[in-house]
């Protein structure tokens, strides 16, 4: 008995012609496009872990994702109108910079239907993801699929990059889910305070504050008085007392 192979063919529409497009379907013609559209509009672009810029010795900028027990970076970029691509950093990367310039260090992701990148074809000169060091100007804008890692402002007279030259204030850091902590002394910016932490902070502040009366030498609580014959220096006159004196 011979094996029989059944071949079926279907005709599919252009995805651009559809008013609604759902997740990966049976007989999906372009799987890469289907997967790369899955989280567009759900996962915001930005850095979720790693991609930390540091001095790399001399005029080198090191970008690493080794941070404590974390050894890989994760970032999300929007590409075109419909796609989202996740980029992982698995190894440290060093960029050689020059003195006397201000740089924008950019992470760039790429996806184009029908285009091979070096990630899947060694004959391609197009990178699926890469770091780019560009001259920074006040009118500088990010392009499609790009995220700003940091800016680096290097004076002309230096021979080594320092941490003070690296500015990450404009980069977009993201988090899916938030860790909750009971600590009232933590300096972390990626952890939310629990109800217990709020109560601890309130109780601590309350225990440290003791109300005191105001006087001519210190600020504090003031009690009002309508008396017109008082010698007190810790009480304040009411409008009634002032009126009585005036009358």
Swiss-Prot record:
Subcellular location: Virion
Keyword Thylakoid belongs to the record: no
One Pfam family in the UniProt entry: Phage_fiber_2
GO cellular component: virus tail, fiber
Region (Disordered) location: 225-247
Listed GO biological process terms: symbiont entry into host cell; virion attachment to host cell
Keyword Ribosomal protein: no
Biased composition (Polar residues): 225-235
Record keywords: Host-virus interaction, Viral attachment to host cell, Viral tail fiber protein, Viral tail protein, Virion, Virus entry into host cell
PANTHER family for the chain: PROPHAGE SIDE TAIL FIBER PROTEIN HOMOLOG STFQ-RELATED (PTHR35191:SF1)
Family the entry assigns: Belongs to the tail fiber family.
Protein name as it appears in the record: Major tail fiber protein S
Organism this protein belongs to: Escherichia phage P1 (Bacteriophage P1)
Lineage of origin: Viruses, Duplodnaviria, Heunggongvirae, Uroviricota, Caudoviricetes
Underlying gene: S
């Amino acid at each position: 008995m011979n094996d029989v192979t059944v071949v079926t063919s279907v005709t599919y529409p252009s995805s651009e012609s559809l008013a609604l497009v759902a997740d990966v379907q049976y007989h999906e013609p372009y799987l890469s496009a289907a997967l790369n559209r899955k989280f567009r509009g759900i996962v915001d672009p930005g850095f979720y872990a790693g991609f930390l810029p540091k001095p790399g010795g001399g005029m080198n900028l090191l970008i690493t994702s080794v941070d404590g027990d974390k050894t890989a970076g994760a970032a999300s970029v929007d590409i075109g109108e419909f796609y989202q691509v996740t980029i992982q950093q698995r190894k440290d990367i060093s960029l050689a910079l020059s003195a006397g310039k201000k740089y924008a260090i950019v992470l760039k992701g790429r996806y184009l239907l029908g285009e091979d990148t070096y990630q899947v074809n060694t004959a391609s000169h197009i990178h699926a993801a890469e770091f780019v060091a560009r001259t920074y100007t006040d009118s500088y804008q990010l392009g499609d699929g790009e995220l700003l890692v940091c800016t680096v402002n290097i004076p002309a007279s230096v021979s080594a990059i320092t941490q003070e030259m690296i500015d990450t204030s404009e980069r977009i850091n993201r988090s899916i889910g938030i860790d909750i902590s009971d600590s009232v002394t933590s300096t972390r910016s990626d952890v939310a305070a629990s109800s217990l932490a709020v109560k601890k902070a309130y109780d601590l502040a309350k225990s440290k504050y003791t109300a005191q009366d105001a006087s001519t030498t210190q600020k504090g609580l003031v009690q009002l008085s309508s008396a017109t014959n008082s010698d007190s220096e810790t009480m304040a006159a009411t409008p009634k007392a002032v009126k009585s004196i005036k009358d």
